[in-house]
């Protein structure tokens, strides 16, 4: 197997050394260079061709956000994984990086020597980033595909549920910022994200959306016209008393919050009066819930492969045979709105 070539960007000598040591302990990864800031990286990209870049956000001369903008402006298609501090400013910067096109992020520990705990997670993300980039086949964006075997039959929608993972923040931004203020249903969202980051994520969406967006809290009564984002580290469910329930029950598919937990819970309450959407992400989370929602008479959507950062979760949902509509990301909000307003049959 050809080694994955990586450039490590960090202004700290210690962090660069620790990250390089972690990556080079893996036989399939080769660190071909390091950079002390964004400008240094841009100079190195003139002569080096990495497969993946790891990028610190808070750096002098040219920070992570400025670096991402510069790399994207050069039309260089290299997946970038950002290291984020867990400070409020760091989380806000992380959201900005994801919207600018960063492939994924890793929370940076407060103490450098705790970085080793994230070794497996970092290597996994680098492998996924590399495989997605090398397997890209430019293809036309297909229109909405309606599966002939599944008739859309739900009469009145009372809730929308959406799940996403890798690539989800940018995808959800495209969807939720299109929702109108008078969306006459509650919207529940699960985005795989570490503890602490979902508040910044929800705030960013709220600042740029007509509809209200907030991080969900345990026991609160959900309302129409509000988007509720599951907090990192908690499963989100809904109950028959119109309340949100957050739990620390064991992870599903290795994640918490899990899309399936939300989908299955919501299907029990809303029966046929629900529409679900599974967006970009790795793994199979959301596939079981999609099947249950369809079996109960709800309407199901999965994102088209052509627009996914990772066609994992939408593929698993599609392969259940229970997906009504396969939709490119730019059309997902429009389709949901049509269904909620009874314009899609």
Swiss-Prot record:
Residue span(s) of domain CheB-type methylesterase: 153-343
EC number, as in UniProt: 3.1.1.61, 3.5.1.44
InterPro entries for the chain: CheB-like, CheB_C, CheY-like_superfamily, Sig_transdc_resp-reg_Me-estase, Sig_transdc_resp-reg_receiver
Localization (cell): Cytoplasm
First-level EC class: hydrolase
A Gene Ontology term for the protein's cellular component: cytoplasm
GO annotation terms (biological process): chemotaxis
GO molecular function: phosphorelay response regulator activity; protein-glutamate methylesterase activity; protein-glutamine glutaminase activity
Signal sequence, start to end: none
Modifications after synthesis and translation: Phosphorylated by CheA. Phosphorylation of the N-terminal regulatory domain activates the methylesterase activity.
Pfam families: CheB_methylest, Response_reg
Keyword Phosphoprotein: yes
Modified residues (4-aspartylphosphate): 56
Keywords of this entry: Chemotaxis, Cytoplasm, Hydrolase, Phosphoprotein
Matching SMART domains: REC
Domain Response regulatory residues, every copy: 5-123
Function: Involved in chemotaxis. Part of a chemotaxis signal transduction system that modulates chemotaxis in response to various stimuli. Catalyzes the demethylation of specific methylglutamate residues introduced into the chemoreceptors (methyl-accepting chemotaxis proteins or MCP) by CheR. Also mediates the irreversible deamidation of specific glutamine residues to glutamic acid.
Domain characteristics, as noted in the entry: Contains a C-terminal catalytic domain, and an N-terminal region which modulates catalytic activity.
HAMAP family with a match to the protein in the record: CheB_chemtxs
Family the entry assigns: Belongs to the CheB family.
Name this polypeptide is given: Protein-glutamate methylesterase/protein-glutamine glutaminase
Organism annotation: Clostridium acetobutylicum (strain ATCC 824 / DSM 792 / JCM 1419 / IAM 19013 / LMG 5710 / NBRC 13948 / NRRL B-527 / VKM B-1787 / 2291 / W)
UniProt gene name: cheB
């Amino acid at each position: 197997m050809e080694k994955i070539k990586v450039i490590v960007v960090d202004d700290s000598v210690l962090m660069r050394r620790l990250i390089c040591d972690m990556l080079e302990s893996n036989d399939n990864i080769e660190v071909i260079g390091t950079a002390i800031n964004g400008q240094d990286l841009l100079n190195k990209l003139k002569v080096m061709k990495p497969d993946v870049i790891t990028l610190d956000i808070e750096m002098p001369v040219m920070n992570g956000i400025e670096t991402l903008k510069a790399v994207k402006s050069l039309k260089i298609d290299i997946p970038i994984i950002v290291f984020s501090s867990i400070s409020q400013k760091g989380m806000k910067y992380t959201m900005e990086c994801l919207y600018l096109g960063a492939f994924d992020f890793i929370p940076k520990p407060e103490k450098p020597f705790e970085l080793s705990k994230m070794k497996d997670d970092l290597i996994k993300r680098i492998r996924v980033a590399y495989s997605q980039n090398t397997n890209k086949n430019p293809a036309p964006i297909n229109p909405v595909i309606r599966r002939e075997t599944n008739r859309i039959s739900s009469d009145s929608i009372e809730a929308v549920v959406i799940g996403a993972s890798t690539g989800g923040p940018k995808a959800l931004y495209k969807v939720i910022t299109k929702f109108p203020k008078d969306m006459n249903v509650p919207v529940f969202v699960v985005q795989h994200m570490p503890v602490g980051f979902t508040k910044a994520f929800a705030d960013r969406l709220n600042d740029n959306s007509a509809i209200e967006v907030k991080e969900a809290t345990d026991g609160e009564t959900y309302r129409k016209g509000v988007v509720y984002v599951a907090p990192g580290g908690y499963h989100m469910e809904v109950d028959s008393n119109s309340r949100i329930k957050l739990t620390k029950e064991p992870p599903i598919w290795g994640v918490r919050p899990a899309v399936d937990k939300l989908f299955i819970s919501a299907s029990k309450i809303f029966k046929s009066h629900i529409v679900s959407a599974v967006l970009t992400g790795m793994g199979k989370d959301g596939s079981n819930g999609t099947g249950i929602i369809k079996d109960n008479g709800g309407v199901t959507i999965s994102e088209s492969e052509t627009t996914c950062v990772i066609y994992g979760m939408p593929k698993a949902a599609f392969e259940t045979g229970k997906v009504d509509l396969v939709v490119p990301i730019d059309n997902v909000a429009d389709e949901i709105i049509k269904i909620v307003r009874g314009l899609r049959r």
